[in-house]
């Protein structure tokens, strides 16, 4: 694979945009745009003569990268339909289907008879660190100067005198998105670098989405929408889990004898009742689960270093990826692709360790995203990597391994 030039994924200017559609019988349609680098902004109303033509001209300018928040699933389909000639009533119908029925853009194209615009576009919704967090919450966390709620219900038919309030609200959201765009510069720069390396547009993807897109391309895997989860999955401890603790051995036996029910809705294994009970181990108590191990005895802890006491924090490099490799967990992709997956994953791991030890942070960070993001997709029912048995094996084995370490450390005199 020949890396592409970084310039393939960058444009001179960022056009941050937001869309408003308000009303039922006589809806109004507004697009607000701010050109970040030029400090210019403009509002485009459907009812105002010439505005849609001006917006169309702006959209055709190849110097712009269009940036929005959740814009891939809402704003861009709406603007695309408007540029295809739809009026506000038709746009409102599309808006309702996008929001209430959660239809995807490609479904909207078929149902409403338009094509998505091919503008250069970044949606920062998945790039931002939270999951399903609103723009207003990000604005609050960043200390944005003003938080404005829409002063009207989205079904209200507005009077012309009320239009300026809608425009003020829309531009405030554009400003918040602009702040978020700047806040995410490091994350977006990394995505541009990785897009150039792998030849895929990764700029709007979360870490896990990037990992899936890259490895899918390398292995030529296909996605077929939502998977049919199995009714149950089981667990078997890998060979590297060994201990003389009767408590841990009892947990291993219970886990091995359990059929974990898989939720048919989200595809995740459900926690059996016995895992809800805290485990007493040495000096502490611990809560196991599908997600991870949590201590319950040290809700608050204060330790001060001194001449006699050293406080250390040890980081385990790529913990879950190491569990995947050392346990020999191979996805059932068929046609030898599971084995190729593990080989590719192991190669990525060794490349990351080399980059980390040599001080190449850019490469190390990008490969870390691939490693951790891939694990994150094992439990996603929509992912090509969906494997609830492997997700369970990774998380449970990781917890048992930590418990074995805790047990061994507490046997050391003075620990």
Language model region names:
Residues 19-21, 35, 373:
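Hydrophobic side chains in beta-strands
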Residues 12-22, 122-123, 312-314:
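Two-metal-ion RNase H-like nuclease active-site motif
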Residues 23-31, 365-366:
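Short, flexible loop/turn motifs enriched in small residues
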Residues 9, 23-27, 305:
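A short catalytic or substrate-binding loop motif that flags glycine-/basic-rich loops and adjacent residues
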Residues 27-39, 317:
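Short conserved beta-strand segments at catalytic cores or DNA/RNA-binding microdomains
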Residues 39-415:
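Conserved acidic
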Residues 13, 30-32, 310:
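Conserved beta-strand and immediately adjacent loop positions that scaffold enzyme active sites
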């Amino acid at each position: 694979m020949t890396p592409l030039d970084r310039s393939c994924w960058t444009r001179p200017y960022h056009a941050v945009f937001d869309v408003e559609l308000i009303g039922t019988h006589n809806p109004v349609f507004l697009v607000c745009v701010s050109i970040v680098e030029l400090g210019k902004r403009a509002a485009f109303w459907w009812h105002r003569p010439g505005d849609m033509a001006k917006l169309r001209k702006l959209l055709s300018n190849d110097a712009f990268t269009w940036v929005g928040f959740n814009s891939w699933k809402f704003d861009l389909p709406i603007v695309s339909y408007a540029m295809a000639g739809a009026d506000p009533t038709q746009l409102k119908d599309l808006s309702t289907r996008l929001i209430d029925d959660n239809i995807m853009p490609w479904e909207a194209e078929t149902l409403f008879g338009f094509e998505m615009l091919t503008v250069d576009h970044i949606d920062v919704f998945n790039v931002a660190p939270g999951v399903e967090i609103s723009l207003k919450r990000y604005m609050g966390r960043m200390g944005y100067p003003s938080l404005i709620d829409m002063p009207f219900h989205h079904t209200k038919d507005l009077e012309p005198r009320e239009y300026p309030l809608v425009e003020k609200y829309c531009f405030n959201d554009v400003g918040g998105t602009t702040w978020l765009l700047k806040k995410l510069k490091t994350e977006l720069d990394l995505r541009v670098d990785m897009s150039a390396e792998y030849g895929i547009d990764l700029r709007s993807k979360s870490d896990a989405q990037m990992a899936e897109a890259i490895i899918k391309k390398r292995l030529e895997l296909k996605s077929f929408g939502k998977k049919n989860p199995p009714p149950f999955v089981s667990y078997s401890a890998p060979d590297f889990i060994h201990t003389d603790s009767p408590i841990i051995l009892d947990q291993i036996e219970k886990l091995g004898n359990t059929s974990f029910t898989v939720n048919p809705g989200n595809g995740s294994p459900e926690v059996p009742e016995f895992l809800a009970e805290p485990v007493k181990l040495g000096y502490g108590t611990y809560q196991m689960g599908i997600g991870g191990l949590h201590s319950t005895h040290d809700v608050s802890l204060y330790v001060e270093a001194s001449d006699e006491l050293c406080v250390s924090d040890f980081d385990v490099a790529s913990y879950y990826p190491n569990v995947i490799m050392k346990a020999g967990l191979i996805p059932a992709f068929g046609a030898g692709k599971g084995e190729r997956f593990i080989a590719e994953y192991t190669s990525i791991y060794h490349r990351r360790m080399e980059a980390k030890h040599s001080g190449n942070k850019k490469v190390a960070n990008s490969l870390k995203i691939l490693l951790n993001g891939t694990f994150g997709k094992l439990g996603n029912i929509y992912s090509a990597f969906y494997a609830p048995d492997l997700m369970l094996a990774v998380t449970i084995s990781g917890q048992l391994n930590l418990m074995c370490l805790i047990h061994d450390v507490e046997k050391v005199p003075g620990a």
